[in-house]
């Protein structure tokens, strides 16, 4: 049943009842004569209020999601996010295709960047940075010099000490503020980072850095945190997905090399990237993380490993000779040493080496031991004594023991008789 509409008379009745201890029925009977004697001009405001109330009642209440947000706002945010992602992919494809059109794709420069953070502010996407690293990369030159810095933001966000301690202890293990290491002037650090990015990108080009999808909100939030303490109006820094760059660049590299690439899809390239074959290499992280065995979480190590992964997957297609420290990690130093046995234990004993294809036996001159070469099989396959477990088994006995006698209780019920039961209870002495 549709709800009753509000009319001007009831608006007048409710207004007249205010301050009077009277029921609605009494008010209606009393106000009826007054309403009849009122002019159209006097009734106009009450009729207008009633019309507005009816319009508001007919308006639908917007549905909400489980977090109490209007669905229209959620859909609008999703559309904006999808549009941003589409624009990002188009820009990545444009950068790669421009290098391919100039026949200089192997020299196209990309900047990889990563941030470590202490904690994240509640209610927004601001992250408190702890460490930053960035490097310039190209397939021909490999990894360029790495710009890295530890960051000391001064004080943690109020109420976030526990979260910061938990996150830090499970990842990079950098000391918490105010005992943090590194640069403490956020404005100066931001200016230096922008200057470094501008020198790498060149004048007139937008500032674009590449990082993983997981670190994209972290990198954007840390840049906003640093920019908030800078007095200068900084340029906008675009943060793009390195995984999509990895996929597009691989496709174009194989196309240039005239290699079949129809079976290359983003799942394959993502899987290769996430394998992170250089994760446990040493001497590619900062000194702090090398000493504390946390190179996996070091930003210096992250950007270096990304460069090595790109080179490992694509340089072979373009016949680019890999160089240690550029296209692959530097030569690993041995962390162990091999020492000879104590000469005092050996004395002046000399040994004659007796070598064979699979063995290397040493014999002392004064010993009666004669080395034998056991690497050659010389047994006679027809001799039973050579294989006692197979052909030298004991013969099976020919006689069999008689089966044990069964009592009346072991005889099936259909074959039992009364005599069987009588014999079963007879006990021999």
Curated annotation (Swiss-Prot):
MF annotations from Gene Ontology: transcription cis-regulatory region binding
Region (Disordered): 383-429
Principal subcellular localisation of the protein: cytoplasm
Signal peptide limits: none
Keywords: Cytoplasm, Developmental protein, Differentiation, DNA-binding, Meiosis, Nucleus, Oogenesis, Repressor, RNA-mediated gene silencing, Transcription, Transcription regulation
Record's subcellular location: Cytoplasm; Nucleus
Pfam family membership, one: Maelstrom
GO CC term, one of those recorded: perinuclear region of cytoplasm
Biased composition annotated in UniProt, kind: Basic residues: 393-403
Known DNA-binding region: 2-65
One of the protein's GO biological processes: piRNA processing
Functional summary from the UniProt entry: Involved both in the piRNA and miRNA metabolic processes. As a component of the meiotic nuage, plays a central role during oogenesis by repressing transposable elements and preventing their mobilization, which is essential for the germline integrity. Repression of transposable elements is mediated via the piRNA metabolic process, which mediates the repression of transposable elements during meiosis by forming complexes composed of piRNAs and Piwi proteins and governs the repression of transposons.
Family indicated by similarity: Belongs to the maelstrom family.
Protein name stated in the entry: Protein maelstrom
